[in-house]
């Protein structure tokens, strides 16, 4: 009903279970659907949607072989341009840091990672001997006992200041999500990526 009311020229889907009925409805309404697959191999939702899609855009060259030849289009992943225009000095100022020590930026994913947070905090005294640490730890995952620690700042989430923090970072430690990989690659920053295990995912991040 919504598609008939809106009468879109095209439907764009990034996957996820909510996308399946929308893409199927688009085909029924004769509205072309474009799918974007960020990961190395298609997820379940996109697999279900591919037969109904006009084209399937993908992030990695290796993904093309998993898709119908007449539908696959290698596009990469769009990068927010503002991420490329950060100011390192502003990033240091925002964190209360100086330029005397290099900066490590730790990103635990959109929801944060207990395992990553615990690992960083367990070796924090050693890290702070040689580095300053910016820690994006996720909602409700701040450690109040570390507030005021010199050379260490923690945030649940950062939005507007993120480009400046990226610019200030000398090393990025991050979960290995597709968007994170593409953004860090675009920034040409040294990085350490932490993939999900094969038990917790399709194994794409390990690949």
Where are these regions (language model features)?
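Hydrophobic beta-strand scaffold residues
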Residues: 33, 133-135, 191
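Well-ordered beta-strand positions
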Residues: 10, 54-55, 71, 171, ...
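Active-site-proximal region of nucleotide-activated glycan assembly enzymes
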Residues: 27-89
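Glycosyltransferases and closely related glycan-assembly transferases
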Residues: 2-12, 18-34, 47-52
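Donor-nucleotide binding loops and adjacent catalytic segments primarily
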Residues: 88-90, 97-171, 181, 204-207
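Residue-level detector of alpha-helix initiation sites
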Residues: 16-18, 40, 44, 110-111, ...
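Short, glycine/polar-rich helix-capping loops at beta-to-alpha or helix-loop-helix junctions
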Residues: 42-46, 59-67, 143-144, 180, ...
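A donor-sugar binding/catalytic signature common to diverse glycosyltransferases
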Residues: 13-14, 162-202
């Amino acid at each position: 009903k919504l598609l008939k009311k809106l009468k879109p020229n095209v439907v764009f889907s990034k996957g996820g279970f909510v996308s399946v009925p929308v893409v199927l409805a688009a085909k029924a309404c004769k509205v072309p659907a474009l799918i974007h697959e960020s990961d190395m191999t298609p997820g379940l939702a996109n697999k279900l949607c591919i037969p109904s899609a006009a084209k399937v855009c993908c992030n990695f060259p290796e993904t093309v072989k998993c898709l119908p030849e007449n539908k696959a289009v290698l596009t990469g992943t769009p990068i927010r341009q503002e991420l490329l225009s950060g100011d390192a000095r502003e990033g240091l100022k925002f964190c209360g840091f100086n330029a005397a020590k290099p900066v490590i930026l730790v990103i635990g994913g959109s929801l944060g990672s207990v395992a990553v947070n615990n690992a960083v905090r367990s070796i924090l005294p050693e890290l702070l001997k040689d580095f300053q640490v910016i820690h994006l730890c996720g909602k409700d995952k701040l450690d109040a006992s570390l507030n005021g620690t010199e050379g260490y700042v923690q945030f649940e989430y950062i939005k507007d200041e993120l480009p400046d923090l990226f610019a200030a970072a000398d090393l990025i430690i991050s979960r290995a999500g597709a968007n994170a990989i593409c953004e860090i690659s675009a920034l040409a920053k040294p990085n350490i990526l932490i993939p999900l295990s094969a038990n917790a995912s399709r194994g794409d991040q390990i690949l």
